[in-house]
């Protein structure tokens, strides 16, 4: 699923996204090959803190690399969703279950 991501999808619900969970923190990159939806991506550390946010442009095959090697999660959402919801680098994300780490373990 990591490799396919949002490829070939034509819609994504307004307040949904795709969370990628990595086995350990590292530097990573995402591209938009075969992806026609404009997306934004947040690179997130193991403490659920947003490190970096980027806009991803449809069909762009150049990877958008993280600058940090502390990326534990990546969250893809509709482009502009982070800004509309006041999420920026430094924001700590959580779900109804708690931190991203707690939420992922609960699944």
What are the roles of these predicted feature ranges?
Residues 1-107:
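Compact, glycine-rich, soluble single-domain proteins
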